[in-house]
Regions:
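Bacterial Sec-dependent N-terminal signal peptides
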Residues: 1-28, 187, 191
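Helix-adjacent hinge/juxtasegments
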Residues: 80-112
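Residues on the lipid-exposed face of transmembrane beta-strands in outer-membrane beta-barrel proteins
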Residues: 27-31, 51-59, 71-73, 96-102, ...
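Flexible, solvent-exposed loop segments that connect beta-strands
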Residues: 36-45, 75-93, 119-140, 169-176
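Outer-membrane beta-barrel channels and translocator barrels
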Residues: 62, 105, 152-155, 192-194
Length: 194
């Protein structure tokens, strides 16, 4: 996992050396509304609100197409109710999406692509009891990201909305399949877009 994250970070930061005139770097942040979906229908599953913050690179491939790799710290989770007990799962990931964008002249961008996520923290809360549950989850999650963004012309500022769908089972020890899915909304700033 550390090797894959290192390769992703090196590739992310080396994009500027390849075609500096077509690459922009930026920062982003915002809110998450996520839940961990599973096939155990006896659990009442409700979403959890979290946040995300990270860096992005915007690489123009052609007049209307761009590639946008990102490295983003993201907090997600789920609330489960089983009988009288309620348990909250809080998970933190480093997400590395690589999005292909179609850019309209008015600043609107449609985007989609694969995402790999690396688990960095996992805790559960049931009443006053807090537990480290990282060993219960797989360290990597593979999924798809799709959404839209809007870059305000001549400012570098933009808005982003995205749906992330986990495709792999993140539950390491359970008898049921669990996948992450959720919405992200946020803002970003590209440094050399003015």
């Amino acid at each position: 996992m550390k090797f894959l994250l290192s390769v992703a970070l090196v590739a992310f930061f080396m994009t500027g050396t390849v075609t500096a005139q077509k690459v922009s770097f930026g920062i982003k942040g915002g809110l998450n509304v996520y839940s961990i979906h599973n096939n155990d229908k006896s659990l009442d599953n409700r979403p959890v609100t979290g946040f995300h913050i990270g860096a992005l690179s915007h690489i123009h491939l052609a007049e209307k197409f761009a590639l946008q790799p990102e490295v983003v710290f993201s907090t997600i989770g789920s609330n489960y109710k089983y009988g009288p007990d309620e348990t909250r799962y809080n998970l933190s990931y480093i997400n590395v999406p690589v999005l292909l964008q179609y850019m309209f002249k008015n600043g609107l961008r449609l985007q989609a692509g694969p995402q790999v996520s690396f688990l960095v923290h996992a805790r559960s809360h049931t009443g006053d009891i807090k537990s480290d549950i990282r060993e219960d989850f797989r360290t990597a999650d593979f999924g798809l990201a799709t959404g839209a963004s809007y870059l305000v012309p001549n400012t570098g500022f933009g808005f982003d909305a995205r749906f992330n769908l986990g495709l792999s089972d993140i539950n390491k020890n359970g008898t049921f399949k669990s996948t992450n899915r959720g919405l992200q909304v946020g803002v970003f700033y590209l440094f050399n877009q003015k």
